[in-house]
Amino acid sequence: MEKHLRLAPSPTGLLHIGTARTALFNWLYARKINGKFLIRIEDTDIVRSKSEYTTNILNGLNWLGLNWDEEPINQSKRVSVHKNYIKRLLESGAAYRCFTSESEILDLREKQKKSGLPPKHDNRHRNLTRKEIKEFISQGKSSVIRFKIDEETEIKWEDQIRGEIKWQGKDLGGDLVLSRRALGDEIGNPLYNLAVVVDDNFMNITHVVRGEDHISNTAKQILIYKALNFKLPIFAHTPLILNSEGKKLSKRDSVTSIDEFKEMGYLPEALANYMAFLGWSIKSPESEILSLSEISKVFNLSDVNKAGAKFNWEKLNWINSQYIKKMELTQLCKFIKKYWEEMGWESPSSEWDLKLTNLIQDSMILLKDAIDQSKPFFILSQMKKEGEEFLESKKEVKESLKYILFYLKEANITKVNKDNAREIINKIIVNHSIKKGILMKSLRVAFFGCLSGPDLIQSWELFSENKIDIPLIERCFN
């Protein structure tokens, strides 16, 4: 039998890092066992579900390289199928109509709260007669459909990550609501637990891999599987992603959507690589920089941790920097030029673009770093305090800069390269007894306004080609 795994997101918001990590684990295991990775959009919440969120989720998965193997299914198009299965449960006696009103439920919960009891339905309408049901309907009362849960029953399964898990029926909050309210003998819109079971069975899902916050849902769903005589899938519950304080990562932790990671300048390969290690570890890793294809060959659900996985920004940044360092120069240049275009910066040539990309590549952590690191080569950089202090620290500082201007003009150099740059530097050192350290620091301050920066000779070439090297040096005398 072909193995099927799935991601079943609700399109009520942007693709979240937690959903993306769940998708990744499903995708990796599907590839490992030569199965299929499927998508089901759980869009039955008419009020909150939006098509633009569906588009965002699918685009985000594509961006991460998580391709799916069949056309995505929309749960909202299968409502009539779900209702038919609810009818089957009603006919078999596994479910019943419950006419308890919202106010009655609130009263019940208030009493339970005062008594220190957890919220739990009292199943008061489980054994209504046909006559009583007709009477409620004639009174215009609406009803939900509830699934009977035997409080004495024990639900257990062998979780692929957590081992054996047991639940007692009495801990599931009373009989489970399968549908929203409806009048007369109608069945309201089916709810999550029923729809999930029916659709997973329809899609021949063999492995359900999802977050640990679904464990209680799994216990309820197993009972529905059995009531409908469906074959149970294998279950695996992944650990939550935690923030630095050990709490569940949420929107309050600023960056959580895949779009935000993309905007910040993370590469999809790097983010996917990092997410794989959020809750999973490889035995005897030769490297932490692995492609999805490489990870899929060694990925196993049994190696996923039970404990929550703390999100580590430093680790993600390091992984991203490694991917930038090994990126082909022309490809990285294309990314960087988009930032230049957004800033309205124009470069002198495509060759110059590649030179600047090569210069800053190894110091970049995020793609967006290209803005700050490229800026001095387009716009006169502001003189920082340490630069101003250095310019006034020794008379040799400004003297060395005057000599640079002199030799540039004497040799009529309009385009600096590494050869004529070194020739000028050597002349100043030999002819004017200026120490090389003073000379190089002076030139760096002129170019960058501070004592740090990328390779000086390569930088000089770029400044010269963009015709701002002389203005940068001359400003030191103003």
Curated annotation (Swiss-Prot):
Record field: catalytic activity: tRNA(Glu) + L-glutamate + ATP = L-glutamyl-tRNA(Glu) + AMP + diphosphate
GO biological process terms on file: glutamyl-tRNA aminoacylation
Compartment(s) of residence: Cytoplasm
Database matches in InterPro entries: aa-tRNA-synth_I_cd-bd, aa-tRNA-synth_I_codon-bd_sub2, aa-tRNA-synth_I_CS, aa_tRNA-synth_I_cd-bd_sf, Glu-tRNA-ligase_bac/mito, Glu-tRNA-synth_I_codon-bd_sub1, Glu/Gln-tRNA-synth, Glu/Gln-tRNA-synth_Ib_cat-dom
Renumbered ranges of motif 'KMSKS' region: 248-252
SUPFAM superfamilies in the record: An anticodon-binding domain of class I aminoacyl-tRNA synthetases, Nucleotidylyl transferase
Swiss-Prot/TrEMBL keywords: Aminoacyl-tRNA synthetase, ATP-binding, Cytoplasm, Ligase, Nucleotide-binding, Protein biosynthesis
Binding positions (ATP): 251
EC number: 6.1.1.17
Domain of life: Bacteria
CDD domains to which the protein is assigned, alphabetical: GluRS_core
MF-aspect GO terms: ATP binding; glutamate-tRNA ligase activity; tRNA binding; zinc ion binding
Motif ('HIGH' region): 9-19
Gene Ontology annotations for the cellular component aspect, listed alphabetically: cytosol
Protein family per UniProt: Belongs to the class-I aminoacyl-tRNA synthetase family. Glutamate--tRNA ligase type 1 subfamily.
Protein name: Glutamate--tRNA ligase
Underlying gene: gltX
